[in-house]
Amino acid sequence: MNRIDRVTAILIQLQSKRVVKAQEIADRFGISLRTVYRDIKALEESGVPLAGEAGVGYSIMEG
């Protein structure tokens, strides 16, 4: 899976669940946590309003 497809799939996963942990994303796509953090940063830089909290996970901000 290329990066664009993976980042899109991560966005869909974030839209379908209230909170998603980085480890869940890493396990689902067979990638490292560092790659998850880079992909999340790419989503944020493209304008997706994300909230992340250590030990809790990532979610899309409402509003």
Features from the language model and the residues they span:
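Short, basic/aromatic recognition patches that contact phosphate-bearing ligands
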Residues: 1-63
